[in-house]
Structures are given as structure tokens and as C-alpha cells.
Amino acid sequence: MNKYHIITLILCLFCLGGAATASPDRTAAAPDTQARSSQLKVSGIIKDDAGSPLIGVTIVVKGTSSGSVSNSDGSYTITVPYAEATLMVSYIGYAPQEINVNNRTRIDITMVEDSKALEEVVVVGYNVQKKETITGSISTITTKDLKQSPTANINNALAGRMPGLLVNQFNGGEPGNDAAQLNIRGKSTYGKSDVIMIVDGIERDMSYLSPDEIETFTILKDASATAPYGIRGANGVIIVTTKRGRKGEKPTVDFKASVGVSEPIRYPDYLGSAGYATLYNEAMLNDNPSLDPGSASLFSQETISNFRRAKGDNSDGLGYNWDYFDYAFKPSILQDYSLSVRGGTDRARYFILGSYYNQGGNYKHSNSDNVNKFLRYNFRANVDVDATKRLKISVDLGARVTEFNYPGATAANIISLANTQPPYLPIILPNNHNDVNQADFEENGGYLLYADNDYRYNMLGQLNRTGFSKRTRRYLQGSFKLSHDLDFITKGLSVAAQFSYDTYNQHTINNSVPTHSTGNLTYPGYSTWMLPTEYSIDEWKNNADYWIKNGTYVTANQRTTDDAQSNSISHGSPEGTSRFQARLDYARKFGDHNVSGMLLFYLQNKVISNQVPFRYMGFSGRATYDYRNKYLFEFNIGYNGSENFARGKRYGVFPA
């Protein structure tokens, strides 16, 4: 019993010692708690890096909902709950900051521009507007999203990346010839439904721009967003801004090199020779029940059995089993290189880029890589100079060269041939004992089979014996812009004028082998072999090696040698487009009220050497108002005219 009393006494002493030890800690914590509970009023002025006060900067105490906004003179006042609090400062277009109070009551803040915040500012209808105050329907992405798709054409890279944008590819898909058609919110007319493309404020094609020269993409979808463009904006507008230098940015050199592989996702899965022959017989008997099962127009069961056991190249004498897609197509190599320099000082900013893109072809058996590839060269130089405190000069220069190389046979023709040729028909005859044209076939490395009127073309012939074409397009684009602040008249007022000139020409070299016609049928211009008329293609079904043993062939298309290539060189009519813009902008904040407006005159004159000049002219206006970024009002109007319409009906008013 005494033992239990001793244990109880020890436990009591232990508890008292623990309590005595804990007390000093609680007492020491009291001053800290008292310090954190004391409030502190902090004030100051917020300016940009040029020393101008910033209006509407948001200041929030980290970890709380307590915040404030800077006034028209950049001043702010905020109460923090304790002296060691942290202030989070943010403003559209500037890098966010976190500032420790450290028991200070006066904190002046300088905001630094940040390109990462540009996504919060959107280019809309010849103007720039905060994303949060836009009433129209828009979508925006940056270059980072586009670089995930290494394609020769920017249009294709937009697929699935912007809501409301439909991307459809209707071209053949050859290197460079794969530009997708863009529609915003579907196709709205049976007529021309192309969207308007605006590059740095100028209506230009963006298809073959390099992703490395692009800053942002914005699409304008509804009437309020597209009204400044008039009736041409009915199908939507895509606005592209290219990269520019930033103020105070140290020179930065970027080099990019990427290599990739391009190939079709999948090919059609067709029947082999055995399956084709089985269903062919079934179809023939269904069409003509009285047909003798032993007819020469049908495949024999022995032939079908041989097809099932055959290797496919007839090296075992059991017949052919061609996969035309596997024979004709292969993966291709993509190469993309770019070098750019970007930087700026307090007075001048610049961005310069050069890039090279090479997309190899997907055709096998082409006689030269030059027959099937696409090349693109891009150059861009954007320079901004602050001539005076109020006058800004911008000079933009863009150049682009594209080179398309493709065989005389079109992609549609080659794919159609792969889709329709029976798998049991050979493409090349490995041996031929007929002296007629023998030397020509030996020189060309194989004997091309020509069957009958149903199968007039040969896959190998289409790939490497139809000649080639080379189309080179050259683009040169330049613009000169002056902008001037009119703050001496009233704060927030500015005026700008811009002139641009674009020129384009095309040079084509065509070395294709012509086709020729007999009656209603068209035949290739290259020489091929054909079974003699007394031994038709139907009879050949069950005698796959007859032509090897007998060697009784005649030329199929009345050509003992390939036709000569028809060499021709053509120069497309050069195009020149000049544009002039003059605009007046106003943006100012009065306390909680934000007011902005824009008035623009636009003139475009397009000249093609052998056509009548075409002119487009218009006025556009925009007015916006918001109260505390909560209550928004926006009015847009376009008054546009086009020479596409008859006199008296050329102009229209388009409000929204």
C-alpha cells in the first residue's frame, strides 16, 4: 500500500514540475501576441517606373480580405492588423509585388512593367482594353500555346485551342499545302465566310508567320466586338500582335532548334488479296446468279488459298498482296530554327527575328527530295523610338519566302489510286523478256504494270515519273507609325497615324509530264506495260506468273518511252496593297469613373497589275464607360464603304 502512495507522490511532483516549466513559455508569448494584435495605418504613393502616379492599383494585406485602391494622384491608405504584415500590390500590365511593412507607416511603391501581365490587356477593334472591362465576346491565347503544335501553318496550330473557333482542313495535306480554313462560331453564309486577320493593326494574312514572332492571338466573336470592321467583320476577326522590345530590357538573344517527325495518324485498313477475292466472287455471283463458278472472271479457290499463304511479293509464286498506302507513304522530318534579339532602353526598343522551317515530304520512291518538300524563311524587325517625351515612332518590317515542291501527280490523285487499286495487282514487274522498251525499263529501275482501262495509272509512276513543280512566293510588308500625346490639350488624349505597304509575287517552275487522252479516257504520260488484249485482266486473276513465263507484252498507253517534261516558267501578277490609318484616342479616369473613346479613319488600296484597283474606306468609333469596373457600357459603330458594290450602295452603318 505504501508502494502505491510513493508512486502517486512522484506523479504529482512530475506534473507540478511540468506546469512550472510551461508557465514561462506562455508568459514569453504574451508580448508577441500583443504586438500582432496592434493595428497600424500605412500610406504612400504608387508610381510607375517613369514617375507617373498610377490610378486603381490594388493593395491587399496578405492572408486577409482587407484591401485598398490607389486614388487619382496615386496615393493610398490602408490599415494593417499588425506591424509585421505583408502587402500584396497588383496592377494590370505590371509585375505584382509583396512588401513587408516592418512597422513602417509610410511606404512609397514603384511598379515595374511585366510582359506576363499583358494577357490581362486585350487588343480589340483597333484599340487596347482591360480584359475585365470588355463587354464583347473574345478569346485570347499566347505563343506558348502555339508552340505545342510544330506545324508549318499557324492556322493548324489553333485547332482546339480557342472556344468558338472552328478549324477545318480541306487541302491535300502536302508539305506546306495544309492551311486550314478558320470559321468563328460556324459558317454563317453560303458565300465567302473567311474571317478577317489583323496583324499589328493591319489587315494581313497570318498563315505562314513563325510562332516565334507572335506575342498573342485574340478572336473577336460577337457584333459589339466586330462592329468597327463593318460588314467584313460579320464572320469574326482574328487579331495578331507580334513581339516587341520592352523598356529597360537588357538585350536578350534567343535561339531555338527543333527536329520532329510528321506522319499520318492512321491509314485505311483494307482487305488483303484473299479477302478481296472472296468478296469479289460473292458480289459477282449476287449480281449474276447464273454465272458459272468456274468462270475465268472469278477467282478460283486455289488462287484464294494461294493468296492466304503468300508472302505478298510473289517471291513464292503464290501471288501479290500490296498495301498501297505502305508502299507510297513514309514519315517525314521537320526542322525548325529561329534566332531573335530583343531589348530596349528608356528611348528605344527593338525585336529582330530570323527563322527557317523545312518540312520533308511523306512520299516514298520520289526521285528527289526536291520534288516533295516545303521551305519557309521568315524575317521580322519591330523598332519603337521615343523621339520626344510625347512623340513615339514605330517602324515594322516583315519578310517571308515560302517554297512549295511537289510531284506532277496531285495528293488527291495518289490517295485515290491507293484507295482503288486491287491488292493483287503488282506495281512493278521484276522480270520482262520482251525486247520492246526493255532498255527504258532497265534504266528506270523497274517495269511498271499497266492493266486495263479501269486501272490506267501506276503508283510508282505517279510518285516519280510525273515530273515536278516548284512554286515560290515572296512577301514584303512594312509599316511606319507616329503617335503623339496631347496631354497639353486634355489629359488622356492622343493622336496616331500609320502608313503601310505590302507587296507579293509568285514564281512557278512547272516540269510536269503531260497526260494524253483517247476517247473519254485519260492516260499517263509515262510508259508502262500491259497484258496483251487476248489475255485480259480478268483471265490474269488465276495466272499470276503468266506474264513472267511468256513475256508477251505490248506498251499500254502507246508510249514506248516517257513523254518529255513540259518545262514552263510563270510569274504571277505582282500585288501591292497600301493602307493609311489616322486615329484619335481618349482614356481618362475621374475618381471611380473610367471613360475611353476612339475615332479612326481607314483607307486601303489594292493594286494587281492586270486588274482594276480595289479600294476600301471606312470610319470606326468606340466609346466605353465603367464605374468601379462593375458597371460597364460600350458603344461601337462602323461606317464602311467598298468598291465591290454598285454606286449608291457602297456605304453602310454598322452600330453595336
Q: How should these model regions be labeled?
A:
Residues I265-T303, R400-Y450, N505-N550:
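A surface-exposed, glycine/aromatic-enriched loop/edge motif typical of exported proteins
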Residues M1-F379, K392-S394:
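Short, small/polar-rich motifs associated with maturation and membrane association
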Residues G186, T242, L339-T345, A381-V385, ...:
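Residues on the lipid-exposed face of transmembrane beta-strands in outer-membrane beta-barrel proteins
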Residues V253-V261, G354-Y356, V395-V401, A497-T503, ...:
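Transmembrane beta-barrel strands of outer-membrane/channel proteins
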Residues N168, G319-R342, L429-Q438, V513, ...:
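Outer-membrane beta-barrel transmembrane domain signature of Gram-negative proteins
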